[in-house]
């Protein structure tokens, strides 16, 4: 998985046609997709079976370019059989944007499904809070450093840090 991630990251960074800022990107495209790779720091072992890493695929739509509001949905799955998976819907906003760098904050809800360490299945809603520092490396592609906190009412919690790469189309 790590070799695939590094290969795709290098391919995105080597594309030609550099944009001057995220404002240039938003003039052309409203939809975007990204792939995220996370490391888990604060994962309740009862619900995560000691998972250490995870990957996510995100699809999004920018519906207000001036305010920087985006709606995104993520499908998230661990690499192990009994670890949790989630489907989330997040509202994102650009907290800071300057040329090729921006900070994106997000809040959302997710449904998390998995097995406990007693092998009992669970399905729980969670609250998601996130922040991402993103750098525009090509005309429509960016790389980012992400932080995400998920917390549910039955004790499920996870704090994740990771990298992402995505593009607008």
Region annotations inferred by a language model:
Residues 38-43, 112-115, 146-148:
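Extracytoplasmic loops and strand-loop junctions of Gram-negative outer membrane beta-barrel proteins
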Residues 22, 43-48, 76-82, 116-121, ...:
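Outer-membrane beta-barrel domain signature
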